[in-house]
UniProtKB/Swiss-Prot annotation:
It comes from Synechocystis sp. (strain ATCC 27184 / PCC 6803 / Kazusa). Residues 34-503 form the Topo IIA-type catalytic domain. Transmembrane segments: none annotated. Few gyrases are as efficient as E.coli at forming negative supercoils. Not all organisms have 2 type II topoisomerases; in organisms with a single type II topoisomerase this enzyme also has to decatenate newly replicated chromosomes. Disulfide bonds: none annotated. The gene is gyrA. Keywords: ATP-binding, Cytoplasm, DNA-binding, Isomerase, Nucleotide-binding, Topoisomerase. Its EC number is 5.6.2.2. It comes from the Bacteria. GO terms for molecular function: ATP binding; DNA binding; DNA negative supercoiling activity. This is DNA gyrase subunit A. One of its GO terms (cellular component) is chromosome.
Length: 860
């Protein structure tokens, strides 16, 4: 058979290839790969949801076989492969793929190990409440356009009347021709709050929206490192977001064998294959690319994920974990590309543009829904008006109908005789006799009045944009109240990332570090001021073999410096330390700082500014003291910095901040104290890698316990003594309370292990030269008591006292009686029989108090 010449079209091959490929590309972009910015769905997902809705698979109905759904979609709306449709259905049911799943699956729908789902003939599904409430509701109310399906036998919606910004909530990914999209999922409650904020303030900026929507919220939880990638994605539509799994370091106890550290992974980054990750780690260990791993096993169960990476005895857990972050998908990047269809055209969207497109779409759908409801109400009211006319002229209507030859003539006479429309005349002719009763007439009148009110309301909505916006807000709030869930993904500060501290309140905080190395941060407001000699509140869940070792009061914007017994200093921002409740144990400090097992934190210091006029005074266990400029510690590396050079057997124990004009007071267990200046003559400044000089001479069996700094303003009024002068007897009643009017302060506060304490006027501690014995600071009530803390305090100070069992009491310094050096003190905290005072810390003044003091000084 030969082709007719009329059927052959001569064309240039290059033009034909170009045109055909362009048509194919646009078909893929619009009809397959990219989601619509309005409802956040690709055509296949939209067709699945609509087909399930048409099948009646609502949340209150039984499950149906997925094969039935797939067949419905293929036969009516989506003439492609059944595997593609089933895969799309499965993904919408996976809680590890969708932040808010749209389909409720029954059966095996796959796993994070990339296990395939069961065949569609075995699995069942139905719609979730979120789908019916927020995507498919009002679809019959002419809210969206419908078009013919592929063969013209059915109608399908071009978009679903979404009540939420579904594209932001569940995200999307797809590869088209020449372009791709990769939109991360977000928290439903946060996105709704952002949409409401935009409606209330259309001029809101992307930066302000980021305060409401801080970042993606992945279904698998995990962490996001830093905000720079989020900021770039939200402002430009493209950005790289670093995700990191949640891992902790635990000690594994093996009966009969030494304990070992293990890395426990409980959450993985979004779209990470758990089985492939474990295989990857095993390959790296076998290839000697990661050292220190002895065993790896998957202990995940129905209660959650748990990957156990057991380490060798000599392995440093933090180093191994950092290698895992670097070489495995435990840390990976999400390449955000916020591309979606807007009016059928691919467009890269910012966070504000996303919400604006949704807002405009909601205005359109509510306007169309209101017009539909108005039309239906007017049509119904039109019928009721005809019925009311008939009831008002009941006898005449009955006579007319009885006298009419047939229905058509009765209809014509009704239209002409009572000025009715044909629709009204039909309604009268179809009216049942029972509706002629007085009760039915009252019902018709009441319905007419109600419809008149509704019609006026619908007309008001169409006339006023603010009414439409109020309805959008109300519907968003309703969905949030029902479907919002807490955020799963935690956004943490990335190492070296600069953040705006204006976004973090500079609140007072307490930092607690236990002997076993657990650290936590608590708001100072957790502990209200209590009376002296009360028991206090539990501040930590302390195990029997653990106790509180360090206790620091600071502000959240401060840098917290951790000094170890080896003379190394580490640094953290106070707000980086996880905040915890009073009774929480905290987190292992090895998760936050690269501290070797045989190294111990011995001192915590908070710093607000690193300047040249301030110094660190460091004191070692053997009594060596050193002064080094604070500016030398302004750039502390991640793995720490040498703070002092130590001889074998010595340890760095105490570190304080001081000015060159200040003085130093050092106390010992047996109640002795030495007071000397910190100036260049007595204690010259040294570099970091130096040892220091001798501070205090100790008697046999005594040891240093504390050091504090006395401000220069007070030092000028203190007498200077010599080492040869005897420790004078102050005479009189040694436990007598001193008059505060005669001793305005500051005082030296001493607290003993047994819970006794007192305030001693600083003037009773004469200035001496270093390396002396010092003078008596306190007399003990019992021989087994000893001094545990010495602090310089003022009358308006507050202090926190913590015990070995984690009990904390907060009290005012004024509640502790001022006494002489030779007094035994008063009870400052009631202790249990097996408890003892562990540490004492002063509470810094709040920001409000500081501002008040500044304003008073300016006024004076």
């Amino acid at each position: 058979m030969t082709d007719s010449p009329d059927r052959l079209i001569a064309t240039d091959l290059r033009n034909e290839m170009s045109q055909s490929y362009l048509e194919y590309a646009m078909s893929v972009i619009v009809g397959r790969a990219l989601p619509d910015a309005r409802d956040g769905l690709k055509p296949v997902h939209r067709r699945i949801l609509y087909a399930m809705y048409e099948l009646g698979l609502t949340p209150d109905r039984p499950f149906r076989k997925c094969a039935r759904v797939v067949g419905e979609v293929l036969g009516k709306y989506h003439p492609h492969g059944d595997t593609a449709v089933y895969d799309a259905l499965v993904r919408m049911a996976q809680d590890f793929s969708m932040r808010e799943p749209l389909i409720d699956g029954h059966g095996n729908f796959g796993s994070v190990d990339n296990d395939p789902p069961a065949a569609m003939r075995y699995t069942e599904s139905r719609l979730r409440p979120l789908s019916t409430n927020s995507l498919l509701r009002d679809i019959e109310a002419e809210t969206v356009d419908f078009i013919d399906n592929f063969d013209g036998s059915q109608q399908e919606p071009t978009v679903l009347p979404a009540r939420i910004p579904q594209l932001l909530i569940n995200g999307s990914s797809g590869i088209a021709v020449g372009m791709a999209t990769n939109i991360p999922p977000h928290n439903l409650g946060e996105v709704i709050d952002g949409a409401i904020a935009l409606i209330r303030n259309p001029e809101i900026t992307e930066q302000e929206l980021m305060q409401i929507i801080p970042g993606p919220d992945f279904p698998t939880g995990a962490q996001i490192l830093g905000r720079s990638g989020i900021r770039e994605a939200y402002l430009t539509g493209r950005g790289s977001i670093t995700m990191r799994g949640v891992a902790s370091i635990e000690t594994m106890e093996h009966p009969g064998r030494p304990d070992r550290d293990a890395i426990i992974v409980t959450e993985l980054p979004y779209q990470t294959n758990k089985a492939a990750l474990i295989e990857r780690i095993a390959d790296l260990v076998n290839d000697k690319k990661i050292d220190g791993i002895a065993d790896i096993r998957d202990e995940s169960d129905r209660d959650g994920m748990r990957i156990v990476i057991e380490l060798k005895r000599d392995a440093y857990a933090r180093v191994v974990l950092n290698n895992l972050y670097k070489q495995t998908p435990i840390q990976s990047n999400f390449g955000a590309n916020l591309l979606a269809l807007v009016n059928g055209t691919p467009e890269v969207l910012t966070i504000k543009k996303f919400l604006t497109v949704f807002w405009e779409f909601r205005i359109e759908t509510i306007t169309r829904r209101t017009r539909y409801e108005l039309r239906k109400a007017e049509e119904r009211d039109h019928l009721l008006q005809g019925l009311l006319i008939a009831l008002d002229n009941l006898d005449a209507v009955i006579r007319l109908i009885r006298g009419a030859a047939d229905t058509a003539s009765a209809k014509t006479e009704l239209v002409e005789g009572f000025s009715l429309s044909e629709v009204q005349a039909d309604a009268i002719l179809q009216m049942q006799l029972r509706r002629l009763t007085a009760l039915e007439a009252d019902k018709i009148t009441a319905e007419h009045d109600e419809l008149q009110t509704k019609i006026a309301d619908f007309q008001d909505i169409l006339a006023r944009r603010e009414r439409v916006n109020a309805i959008i807000e109300e519907e968003l709030e309703q969905i949030k109240a029902i479907h919002a869930t807490p955020r799963r993904t935690v956004i943490v500060q990335e190492d070296g990332e600069l953040i705006d501290t204006d976004l973090i309140a500079n609140d007072q905080a307490l930092i607690l570090l236990t002997e076993q190395g657990y650290i936590k941060r608590m708001p100072a407001s957790t502990f209200g001021t209590q009376n002296r000699a009360t028991r206090g509140k539990a501040a930590a869940k302390i195990k029997d073999d653990d106790g509180v070792e360090h206790f620091l009061s600071c502000c959240d914007h401060d840098k917290v410096l951790f000094f170890s017994d080896r003379g190394v200093v580490y640094s953290l921002n106070a707000y980086q330390i996880p905040i915890a409740s009073r009774t929480a144990r905290g987190v292992p400090i090895v998760q936050m700082l690269p501290i070797p097992k045989d190294e111990k934190i011995t001192s915590l210091v908070s710093v607000s500014e690193f300047d040249d006029d301030t110094y660190f005074i460091m004191l070692t266990k053997q009594g060596y003291i050193k002064k080094t400029a604070l500016s030398a510690f302004s750039n502390i590396r991640a793995n720490g910095l040498i703070a002092i050079s130590l001889v074998e057997g010595d340890q760095l124990r105490w570190v304080r901040l001081a000015k060159a004009e200040d003085s130093v007071i050092i106390g010992s267990q047996k109640g002795m104290a030495i007071h000397f200046k910190a100036d260049q003559d007595e204690l010259r400044a040294l570099g970091r890698a130096t040892r220091g000089v001798k501070s205090m001479r100790l008697r046999s069996g005594d040891a240093l316990i504390s050091m504090d700094i006395l401000p220069s303003q007070v030092v000028a009024n203190i007498a200077v003594g010599s080492e040869d002068e005897p420790d004078e007897d102050l005479g009189g009643d040694t436990d007598a309370i001193l008059e505060e009017s005669d001793n305005p302060g500051p005082w030296l506060l001493g607290v003993t292990m047994k819970g006794f304490g007192k305030r001693v006027p600083i003037g009773q501690f004469r200035l001496q030269h270093r390396a002396g014995l010092g003078v008596k600071a306190i007399r003990f009530k019992s021989k087994d008591d000893q001094l545990v803390a010495l602090h310089v305090v003022n009358a308006d100070d507050e202090l926190m006292i913590v015990t070995n069992r984690g009990i904390i009491i907060r009290q005012s310094v004024n509640d502790i009686s001022p006494q002489s050096r030779s007094a035994t003190g008063v009870r400052v905290q009631r202790l249990d029989a097996d408890d003892a005072i562990a540490a004492v810390a002063l509470v810094p003044p709040s920001g409000e108090e500081e501002l008040a003091e500044m304003s008073e000084s300016e006024e004076s």
